[in-house]
Amino acid sequence: MLGQPAEGRNTRWARRAVLGVVVAVAVVTVVRYFVWWDVGAHCVIGMRPSLVGYDNTTIKRALATLQSGSPEDYRKVCAHVATINPNPSCGGFGGGCFWHSEGNRGRASIDVSTEHGLIWTVAIIVHETCHAIQYHEGRPPRFDLEHECYGEDDRILRALVQFE
């Protein structure tokens, strides 16, 4: 009889330990694959899961490349982008999209294709961030604003090729 309470405590402790390990693994998995978290820069960007097999590590590598290769562009991404979706949408398999709505008055959601590799992904992130900045500045969406953002992705491509 005296052994049962200790046995019950051990069982409860074991269940809590297993639950703690499961929760820790879940949190690490979510952060590893679905969150860019840069404590030093106060930058947190969520990443949606890919429905077509693209790995979010390309987006994380692109953000790390921006962080070291173009700190100013990295700060802009951190300030204006809350979520990155790696699934092809309106930009198709080679581009990206900026979604503008009243819900994006804070930080925006962008779609980014990772199909063409790291440097192209960086350029798409910078391009779509340019649209987010235009929107947050209150500029009306017009086709001629596209020229400015194409200039931004061209600039970052040239800068990173020289950086590498």
Language model: regions and residue ranges:
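Second-shell loop/turn segments in exported
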Residues: 47-53, 111-116, 136-141
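Auxiliary, metal-adjacent structural segments of Zn-dependent hydrolase domains
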Residues: 41-104
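Short pre-active-site segment immediately N-terminal to the catalytic Zn-binding motif
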Residues: 109-125
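N-terminal Sec-pathway targeting helices
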Residues: 6-26
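Membrane-interface motif at the C-terminal end of an N-terminal transmembrane signal
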Residues: 25-42
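Active-site recognition of the HExxH zinc-binding catalytic motif
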Residues: 123-136
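Post-HExxH zinc-binding segment in Zn-dependent metallohydrolases
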Residues: 137-164
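N-terminal intrinsically disordered, acidic low-complexity segments at the extreme N-terminus
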Residues: 1-2
